[in-house]
UniProtKB/Swiss-Prot annotation:
Induction: By bacterial infection. Pfam families: Antimicrobial11 (PF08106). This is Formaecin-2. It comes from Myrmecia gulosa. Its main location: secreted. It comes from the Eukaryota. Glycans are attached at residue 11. Antibacterial peptide. Has activity against E.coli but none against other Gram-negative bacteria and Gram-positive bacteria. GO terms for cellular component: extracellular region. GO terms for biological process: defense response to bacterium; hemolymph coagulation. InterPro entries: Formaecin.
Length: 16
């Protein structure tokens, strides 16, 4: 997965 500065708790990837 990619590092997400917004949502790193519920999901390892950005939920756009």
């Amino acid at each position: 997965g990619r590092p997400n500065p917004v949502n790193t708790k519920p999901t390892p990837y950005p939920r756009l």
